[in-house]
Amino acid sequence: MMKHILFIFITALFLSTSNSFSQSTEAFFKTADSFFKTYVSNGKVDYKSIEKNPEQLNELLDQAANISVSISEAKEYQAFWINAYNLAVIKGVIDNYPIDSPLDKDGFFDSIKYNLGGTSLTLNDIENKKLRAQFDEPRFHFVLVCGAKSCPPIIAEAYKPSALEKQLQEQTVKALNNPSFIKVSENEVSISEIFKWYNEDFVKNEQTEIGFINQFRKEKIPSNFKVSYYPYNWQLNQK
């Protein structure tokens, strides 16, 4: 009898914990979606308005600090950390606003730490340890937005588990078909330094950079074109 009661108690506790976890992440994605819809448009962030009213951003980061996501739930895990990264970038800008570039603040990516997902970590930690080290997913580079003009554009919605595959694909296709991001000229293509910094993510299994890009392009780039990298514009992606 006691074993039966104990089993029921443990089961109820597990279900209660699972429901609480689900509700906390659901609330985070919903609040994040509202935030991005309010302060992002045309790939730019309205930092001035956020600085005047930082309450929603701070509330989101407080929520994110206490959320635990499991890597076994891959889409939820990825969506959480992508949103957490983009929100932390905005927080870093707001904490030092006004600035012309995230690089104006020393250690913006590799020293300043944020309490997210139950741990303290930098922006580089999120990108490299929480995401790149765990998943073979080069499309992350087109949704993690570093706060600079040369970054792929930030979207006016949260990344959500149920829509993540579609969102990753759409943002990658959008970036790689954008003539300002992939600059094709006669016999040459000039591409973002992202492809140089994270080259190993794009050239696996003997694939070339052009080969990777062509998977997502409507107008294919000839494989014999010369590849160069244009300078990264680190000016703030400000609305």
What does each of the following model-derived ranges do?
Residues 7-17:
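Bacterial N-terminal signal peptides
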